[in-house]
Design a protein with these regions (language model features):
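C-terminal motif of bacterial Sec signal peptides marking the signal peptidase cleavage site
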Residues: 17-19
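Bacterial signal peptide processing site
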Residues: 21-23
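Bacterial N-terminal signal peptides that target proteins for export
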Residues: 1-9
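Extended beta-strand-rich segments in extracellular/periplasmic secretory proteins, especially
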Residues: 82-104, 207-240
Length: 240
C-alpha cells in the first residue's frame, strides 16, 4: 500500500471503561443535553473539487500514528492509535470492496482505525472499519469492529440496507450471537470520515446517535441510538 504525508488531525476522546465483568454501566458518555436547537444535517451531494481529487484519488493511503492514552480498568493505559484513510470503489450489493470497475460501484472513503495497548499483564487490540460514501448524502454503508484481548474476542458488523442490519458475536453470554435491525440514525463511527470530506456538513444540535461500536463493546451497553447534543465551532466538533 502506498502512503503519503498526513494532514494534522487532532481528536480527543475520553472513555470510562469497564473490566471483563459484563456489568452494564449506567453512566453513558453520550448523555442527553437539552438545548434550544434542533439537529441539522447537510444532505446535499458532495462534489469533489480539484484539490480534493488530487489528494484522495491518487491510489495512496493517508496513515497517521498517535500516542494513545486509553482509560481501562480504572487506569490510564498507554499504547498506539493509527488512522488509515483511503478511497475505494465499493460494491453496494455485497457491501465489499469492488474487484473491478463497474457502474454500480460507489466511491467511498474508508477509515481503518486501530488501537493497541496493554493493561498491565495482557494486550488489547481494537480495529474499526467505516465505509462512507464520498457523495456525503447518506449514512455509512458499512461499519465493523473487532476487539481481541485475553478475556476473549468480539465482532460486530453494521450493514446499511433498508434498515441498519446488525450481526454481532461476543464471548459474553448476554451479547452472544445476535442478528437484529435498527432504525437509521447518525453513527458516531461515520463522523470521522464525514469530517474529512466536509466538516461543515457535520450534524449539530440535539441529535440521536449510535455510539461507536468500540464504545458499545467496552462499556457493555445496548447497541441503539442515544440522545446527545452536537456543536461545531472553528477547529472543533463536540458531542455531549
Amino acid at each position: 500500500m502506498k502512503t503519503k504525508n498526513t494532514l494534522p488531525l487532532i481528536v480527543s476522546a475520553l472513555l470510562i471503561l469497564l473490566s471483563c465483568t459484563n456489568k452494564e454501566s449506567k453512566d453513558l458518555a453520550l448523555l442527553v443535553t437539552k438545548k434550544d436547537t434542533k439537529a441539522t444535517t447537510v444532505t446535499e451531494t458532495f462534489k469533489p473539487n480539484k484539490d480534493f481529487s488530487a489528494y484522495w484519488y491518487t491510489g495512496e493511503a493517508e496513515i497517521t500514528s498517535y500516542k494513545l492514552e486509553q482509560s481501562r480498568y480504572g487506569e490510564t493505559r498507554h499504547g498506539t492509535a493509527i488512522l488509515i484513510y483511503v478511497t475505494e470503489p465499493f460494491l453496494e450489493t455485497k457491501q465489499v470492496k469492488a474487484d473491478y470497475s463497474n457502474p454500480p460501484n460507489i466511491n467511498v472513503l474508508k477509515l481503518n482505525r486501530t488501537k493497541n495497548f496493554t493493561t498491565g499483564i495482557y494486550p488489547y487490540s481494537i480495529m474499526q472499519s467505516t465505509f462512507y460514501p464520498i457523495a456525503n448524502n447518506r449514512h455509512a454503508i458499512k461499519v465493523s469492529c473487532s476487539i481481541q484481548e485475553w478475556c476473549g474476542h468480539v465482532y460486530t458488523q453494521l450493514n446499511n440496507r433498508k434498515q441498519f442490519e446488525i450481526d454481532a458475536h461476543s464471548y459474553f453470554e448476554n451479547q452472544a450471537d445476535s442478528n437484529f435491525t435498527l432504525d437509521k440514525n447518525i453513527l458516531e463511527n461515520e463522523l470521522w470520515t464525514q469530517l474529512r470530506i466536509d466538516p461543515k456538513s457535520l450534524p449539530v444540535g440535539d441529535i440521536s446517535i449510535i455510539p461507536s461500536l468500540e464504545f458499545i463493546h467496552l462499556k457493555h451497553v445496548p447497541l441503539k441510538a442515544y440522545q446527545a447534543s452536537a456543536s461545531l465551532a472553528k477547529g472543533s466538533y463536540t458531542l455531549n
